[in-house]
């Protein structure tokens, strides 16, 4: 901390107090964001509202169904329903997050739990293979990748004219306990592969993690998988 040069006891004390308050405010005030219509993704709007406001950014959450309604207007989505019996007679209890029969499209939102246990990573791959076997395209949205206009174009091949999530806001922080440090090796490998697909999102998240304690971010471990 740089202390102001003393001119008198009173003026120096006042300057020191103002400087100290400024530093404390910088540490305690969440990242300032402009008013955003679109927030961090949650599987549903109900879960988004339960999660409330993100303490780091002051930004709300937005249910995936609201994003889908803008990306694919006038289409019907089936949420969290068993895949059921297929044309070949095989029956499945697995439940994709969102399924659109008209588009033959399945959209999965993968939260932190999908990166913490190797059996979950394996199960996701197995389920995706089943969906694809029956002619569905599967789009997976990792919790650390937000639906910016560029990401939507990459994932869905759709150009949305209105601004979506701001590309400048990171998705991971030690405070939220959703960093690479909380992932298993299989999850880290998967995370690295997915981040490479979105260089801009990778850059903004890596930059944010660099400013925090590596013990709590696990950035140095993730970087080994990114090589």
PLM regions and their residue ranges:
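Nucleic-acid endo/exonuclease domains
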Residues: 2-227
């Amino acid at each position: 901390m740089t202390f102001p040069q003393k001119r008198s006891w009173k003026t120096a004390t006042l300057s020191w107090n103002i400087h100290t308050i400024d530093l404390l405010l910088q540490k305690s005030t969440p990242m300032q964001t402009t008013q955003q219509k679109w927030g961090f993704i949650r599987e549903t709007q109900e879960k988004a509202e339960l999660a409330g406001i993100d303490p780091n950014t002051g930004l709300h959450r937005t249910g995936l169904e609201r994003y889908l309604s803008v990306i694919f207007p006038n289409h019907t989505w089936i949420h969290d329903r068993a895949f059921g019996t297929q044309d070949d007679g095989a029956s499945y209890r697995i439940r994709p997050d969102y399924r659109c029969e008209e588009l033959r499209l399945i959209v999965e939102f993968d939260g932190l739990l999908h990166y913490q246990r190797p059996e979950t990573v394996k199960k996701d791959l197995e389920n995706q293979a089943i969906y694809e076997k029956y002619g569905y395209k599967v789009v997976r949205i990792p919790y650390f990748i937000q639906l910016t206009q560029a990401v939507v174009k990459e994932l869905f091949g759709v150009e949305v004219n209105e601004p979506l999530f701001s590309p400048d806001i990171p998705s991971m922080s030690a405070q939220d306990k959703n960093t690479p440090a909380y992932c298993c090796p299989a999850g880290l490998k998967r995370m690295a592969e997915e981040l490479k697909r979105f260089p801009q999102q990778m850059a903004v998240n890596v930059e944010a993690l660099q400013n925090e304690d590596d013990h709590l971010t696990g950035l140095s471990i993730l970087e080994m998988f990114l090589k």
